[in-house]
Amino acid sequence: MIKEELIVKTTALPQSRIALELEIPSNTCKSCVNETINSISRSAKIPGFRLGKIPKQVLIQRIGITQLHASALEKIIDKSWNQALKMESIEPLSEPELVDGFESILKFFNPEKPLKITLQTDIAPEFKLKKSKGLSVEIKKSKFDPKSIDEALEKSRNQLANIIPVNNRPAKLGDIAVVSFKGVYKDSKKEIDGGSSDSMDLELEKNKMIPGFVEGIVGMKIDDNKTLTLRFPEDYSHEDSRGKEAIFDISLKDLKEKELPELNDDFAKQSGNKDSLKELKKDIEKQLKENFDNTQKNIKVEALMDALSKELDAEIPKAMIDIEVRNNIEQTAQRFAQQGMDIKSTFTPELVKSLAESTRPQAEKNVQRNLALKALSEREKITVDNEEIDQKMKEYEDEISKSPKQIDIQKLKDVVRNDLLQEKLITWLEENSAVKEINEKATKLTTKTTTKATTKKGVKTKSKPKVNKKEKN
């Protein structure tokens, strides 16, 4: 007896999709029908018959031939689909779509005859770089501004300040005002979402709140009331409020001011655990310069990555971007969970939809960059060998030894491999591209902004990957 085999025909479709026409032999169809009957028989309960001993015809009569064929057809499609993927060495990016529809196929399904179906799916695109060497980019030339040291010291002074009450003068910039306020839209008189408070400590600094809010409080005395008519900026974070006029009724309930510590050796000991103010300034300068250099490095890398991405010749399928969006949301949820938040109540369908929409542009950019880097790796034959990975893994020996059961070594190695490869690719880009610096005024950097000077999707300098821990079942 000649064994019947699955026949597969593939057709390339636009937008990195592929169609697989399958001719499934009747012996596969009959086998799946019998498997389905046996599976149902093991759990079906029919009066007068023992469990697992129900005759085939009785079982078919009880559950119905259509239901039986539907269950079997799902098994046939799934089994044949996976077999076809292996035969053609295809790695799909999405679940298959049945071209003619399940109900239509079920209607004409006959296990005694071969079954012909067509499925479509997304696949990774064929990609290549139009150009890799000789890329040219322009970045703004910046130089370290010594004033940022004084700004860092002033920030530290504010953090260590004593808060004292104010009773005998009006509010001024730099004070801490305790205010109650209620805001409504001028046209509709509808209360503004998040635009009211019974008591809020507000540092009177420019650019806090919407334009005119802080300035309106300046000059008020305790127990004073004031009504302000203000306009939300066109780029305000809440879309419903953008450009709208609003009326705020404000009461000044209390007023405080900061008593700043003197800049001396005692301050150095309290602020940075240094013996002298001179030593503290030197330490701050070193940190800020390192952060400044890293920021400039990342600005250059960002420009080179954008230039490389533009050289990518590929049609990126929607499924790849969908996967990236989903991964980003899952990573955000994991961070929230680590902070003790209830994910089920926090990540509502509305929030997930909003996150998907807001992160999609960056996700598309990330996918394009990753494909461009992969294309560069293949084009220039840039790789990472096992010896390099093993050498890097030594940096994590202490952490691994502390919790060996919680750390997934293979995942950690994959992260290390990707990071090392990315470092090599970026170094290659820097060495084989032209970067022109355009003059600009000195850039001021604060400790807050510089400590977060990294680029998107892990493209950073001198980075150290996080240790991935195994998920608990």
Swiss-Prot record:
Q: Which GO terms describe its cellular component?
A: cytoplasm
> Domain PPIase FKBP-type: where?
174-261
Q: Which Pfam families match?
A: FKBP_C, Trigger_C, Trigger_N
**Location of this chain's protein in the cell:** Cytoplasm
Instruction: Write out the biased-composition intervals (Basic residues).
Output: 454-467
Kindly provide the name given to this protein in its UniProt entry: Trigger factor
- Give the catalytic activity: [protein]-peptidylproline (omega=180) = [protein]-peptidylproline (omega=0)
Q: What is its main location?
A: cytoplasm
Tell me the keywords, alphabetical order.
Cell cycle, Cell division, Chaperone, Cytoplasm, Isomerase, Rotamase
Q: What is its EC number?
A: 5.2.1.8
What's the entry's take on its domains?
Consists of 3 domains; the N-terminus binds the ribosome, the middle domain has PPIase activity, while the C-terminus has intrinsic chaperone activity on its own.
Species annotation: Prochlorococcus marinus subsp. pastoris (strain CCMP1986 / NIES-2087 / MED4)
Query: Which purpose does this protein serve, as stated in its record?
Result: Involved in protein export. Acts as a chaperone by maintaining the newly synthesized protein in an open conformation. Functions as a peptidyl-prolyl cis-trans isomerase.
Question: What superkingdom does the record give?
Answer: Bacteria
Q: Name one GO molecular function term.
A: protein folding chaperone
Q: Where is this region: Disordered?
A: 442-473
Gene Ontology process terms (BP): 'de novo' cotranslational protein folding; cell division; chaperone-mediated protein folding; protein transport; protein unfolding
Q: Where is the composition biased (Low complexity)?
A: 444-453
Q: Which family, according to UniProt?
A: Belongs to the FKBP-type PPIase family. Tig subfamily.
